[in-house]
Amino acid sequence: MAEIKNYTLNFGPQHPAAHGVLRLVLELDGEVIQRADPHIGLLHRATEKLAESKTYIQSLPYMDRLDYVSMMSNEHAYCLAIEKLLGVDVPIRAQYIRVMFSEITRLLNHLMWLGAHGLDCGAMNMLIYCFREREVLFDMYEAVSGARMHAAYFRPGGVYRDLPESMSQYKVNKIRNAKAIDALNENRQGSLLDFIDDFVTKFPKLVDEYETLLTDNRIWKQRTVGVGVVSPERALNLGFTGPMLRGSGFAWDLRKQQPYEVYAQMDFDIPVGKTGDCYDRYLVRVAEMRQSNRIIKQCVDWLRVNSGPVITSNHKVAPPNRESMKSNMEELIHHFKLFTEGFHVPEGEAYAAVEHPKGEFGIYIVSDGANKPYRLKIRPPGFSHLAAMDEMSRGHMIADAVAVIGTMDIVFGEIDR
């Protein structure tokens, strides 16, 4: 009788559940995975090398394009690393704005993850629900930066501009009549803070809707409970961070353990899982959305009553405002020098990490005293998570590999860099 051998299956890179350009070479015994070999590099754009030939400010928009679902969180780590080397103090109002937008970014990321993960596992309506809320969050991005995705809003020394006092309005068009437009503009009558406050008030009920659809759903539980189990010790050894580590029962969060900006003043909890499977990681991320909502509310309340500058007054690092630039020769020179030559960073090295929605996102900069980094190293959270793909999917069915990829929340912009 002929010997029955394992066969090889290529999963991706064109597969819709591959979350980008993942190529998995699966060794299968029937439908059971014996080995999973992830092939990466299909979205490699040499970001680290490009940064060596650009000034510090010119490299900032590259950060948005790493994890292109959590744009401002990438910028945050980059700015913190530069500020460490420069020794620049960030105004307190700018710190609150940064924290608020970092948490808005966390909501954007987790909503994208929840919609895509649900879709991968067969819960198609989740994507529609989640994108409904993402649309509102993108409007917040657009209000401060003019861009809905690649904002480039955080700058070394603060943020690009203060929060606007008015929101853009929808106008009557061929698709919607005046009544529909009035309904859309109902929460856009005040400032951006009013708009955010309105969203924060409604959001907990919307999260309840997601939980109604999934948390006790029998099919969802069958697809996620007991799949991709990782023990706390193994999660640490594999280099897991963020929800992947907390889902295994390890309460590690940089916002609590190594607070940066104004996180030390914020009141929030760290959701932690028990069993370390896909279902636990789902519960952790949903609970994180509720905590992010709490943080945003605290920032909104503080920003309402406290005014002040939003970027450092050191014009060798941050540009002067337009009014003074047009009337003062010295300010014009500062502006010109900053956007042609850039600022020179003192010799040294610095590592700054933030609690990115996916885990610990770190930027390591080595400076030789020039206006460009000598070396820039990006520490993406998804890289070490994807490395555990083989271990997490071994012994499971092909359909479970989709659930494992979904629970990792991987984006190839940051993995391939």
UniProtKB/Swiss-Prot annotation:
Gene3D superfamilies: Cytochrome-c3 Hydrogenase, chain B
Record-linked InterPro entries: NADH_Q_OxRdtase_suD, NADH_UbQ_OxRdtase_49kDa_CS, NDH1_su_D/H, NiFe-Hase_large
Subcellular location: Cell inner membrane
GO MF entries: NAD binding; NADH:ubiquinone reductase (non-electrogenic) activity; quinone binding
Catalysed reactions, semicolon-separated: a quinone + NADH + 5 H(+)(in) = a quinol + NAD(+) + 4 H(+)(out)
PROSITE patterns for this protein: COMPLEX1_49K (PS00535)
SUPFAM superfamilies xrefs: HydB/Nqo4-like
Major place of residence: membrane
Domain of life assignment: Bacteria
Main EC class the enzyme belongs to: translocase
EC number annotated for this UniProt entry: 7.1.1.-
Keyword NAD recorded: yes
Keywords: Cell inner membrane, Cell membrane, Membrane, NAD, Quinone, Translocase, Transport, Ubiquinone
Subunit: NDH-1 is composed of 14 different subunits. Subunits NuoB, C, D, E, F, and G constitute the peripheral sector of the complex.
The name this protein goes by in its record: NADH-quinone oxidoreductase subunit D
Source species of the chain: Polaromonas naphthalenivorans (strain CJ2)
